[in-house]
């Protein structure tokens, strides 16, 4: 039997076998056995080395025609098998389209967003404006304009993510004090603003620390602003946030950009000041830092510190939310666990 006859015989057997194939695995096996690298056609074509130059094109064309014919019938058979499998599945499986589908999880505003909006609403009612700032900040505004010149020892209080020697991720929202004072026209009146936003520190993440968290900076600058104005403002805000029965305690502290500086404590809202695990049995909870704007900060913004004065404060959104809702791990705010978040819907 010559090569032409062998190819024709292989063609007939292959197409005959193709008609009886009933599943995709058998179909693929047939293609491999007949046309694969070690298949029958390959073995037949090894004999082409013995053909004359005139015979080789004829046998080659015959082999290619066989491959093309088989390829077309193979694809048609494959579609036929797939359709048969689908039809069988439709007959054997039932679907009740009247059954309710899986309910989608209901979204809601994040608890930190809710906290921020509540604080903003309080200050808007007091005539404050809300300003946004840069999360990528310059060393000049983040430190130097906050009375922290190069090599100032107080810079060690904050571990910083530096991008370049002069560009960094802001460590507090305080740079907005300087930026807002620079842009404000004090000839038209004083300045009252809050600046909410994310800040970054090189902290190790644990239950009470995060490398990223939220602050709300507050600033008031005008003529004749005193510590009494600061105390009255924070007393009003804290009572709106934690209840009218709350008391505030003021302790001397140190911040480079305020003088004098204070730490503000609030009477424990859980035990009423009697002592419990929330207040560590002291009756008081540390809530924020504040103070009168340092004269150097005012002067660097072009203001005469003998004429203008002001106060500033910083609120931590996570801390307020943790205290109000009894949350003991700050990481819950950022892990995206719906079971945690839906508690505050």
Curated annotation (Swiss-Prot):
It comes from Lactococcus lactis subsp. cremoris (strain MG1363). Binds 2 magnesium ions per tetramer. Pfam families: Phe_tRNA-synt_N, tRNA-synt_2d. Its EC number is 6.1.1.20. Keywords: Aminoacyl-tRNA synthetase, ATP-binding, Cytoplasm, Ligase, Magnesium, Metal-binding, Nucleotide-binding, Protein biosynthesis. This is Phenylalanine--tRNA ligase alpha subunit. It catalyses: tRNA(Phe) + L-phenylalanine + ATP = L-phenylalanyl-tRNA(Phe) + AMP + diphosphate + H(+). GO terms for cellular component: cytoplasm. One of its GO terms (biological process) is phenylalanyl-tRNA aminoacylation. The keyword ATP-binding applies. It comes from the Bacteria. Mg(2+) binds at residue 259. Belongs to the class-II aminoacyl-tRNA synthetase family. Phe-tRNA synthetase alpha subunit type 1 subfamily. SUPFAM superfamilies: Class II aaRS and biotin synthetases, tRNA-binding arm. GO terms for molecular function: ATP binding; catalytic activity, acting on a protein; magnesium ion binding; phenylalanine-tRNA ligase activity; transferase activity; tRNA binding. Its cofactor is Mg(2+). The lineage of its organism: Bacteria, Bacillati, Bacillota, Bacilli, Lactobacillales. Tetramer of two alpha and two beta subunits. It is found in: Cytoplasm.
């Amino acid at each position: 039997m010559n090569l032409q006859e062998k190819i024709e015989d292989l063609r007939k057997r292959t197409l005959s076998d193709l008609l009886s194939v009933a599943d995709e695995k058998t179909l693929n096996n047939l293609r491999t056995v007949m046309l694969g690298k070690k298949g029958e056609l390959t073995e037949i074509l090894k004999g082409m080395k013995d053909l004359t130059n005139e015979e080789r094109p004829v046998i080659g064309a015959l082999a290619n025609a066989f491959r093309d014919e088989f390829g077309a019938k193979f694809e048609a058979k494959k579609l036929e098998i797939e359709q048969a499998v689908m039809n069988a599945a439709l007959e054997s499986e039932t679907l009740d389209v009247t059954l309710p589908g899986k309910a989608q999880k209901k979204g809601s505003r994040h608890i930190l967003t809710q906290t921020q909006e509540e604080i903003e609403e309080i200050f808007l009612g007091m005539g404050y404006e809300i300003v946004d700032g840069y999360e990528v900040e310059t060393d000049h505004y983040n430190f130097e304009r906050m009375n922290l010149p190069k090599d100032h020892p107080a810079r060690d209080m904050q571990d910083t993510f530096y991008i370049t020697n002069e560009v960094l991720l802001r460590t507090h929202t305080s740079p907005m004090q300087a930026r807002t004072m620079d842009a404000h026209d004090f000839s038209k009146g004083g300045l009252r603003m809050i600046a909410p936003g994310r800040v970054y520190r090189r902290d190790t993440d644990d239950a009470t620390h995060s490398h990223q968290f939220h602050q709300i900076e507050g600033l008031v600058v005008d003529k004749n602003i005193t510590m009494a104005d600061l105390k009255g403002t924070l007393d009003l805000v804290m009572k709106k946030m934690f209840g009218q029965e709350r008391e505030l305690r003021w302790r001397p502290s140190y911040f480079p950009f305020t003088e004098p500086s204070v730490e503000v404590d609030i009477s424990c809202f859980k035990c009423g000041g009697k002592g419990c695990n929330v207040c560590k049995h002291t009756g008081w909870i540390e809530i924020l830092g504040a103070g009168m704007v340092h004269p150097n900060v005012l002067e660097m913004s072009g203001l005469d510190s003998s004429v203008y004065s002001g106060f500033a404060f910083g609120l931590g959104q996570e801390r307020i939310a943790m205290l109000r809702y009894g949350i003991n791990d700050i990481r819950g705010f950022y892990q995206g666990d719906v079971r945690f978040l839906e508690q505050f819907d």
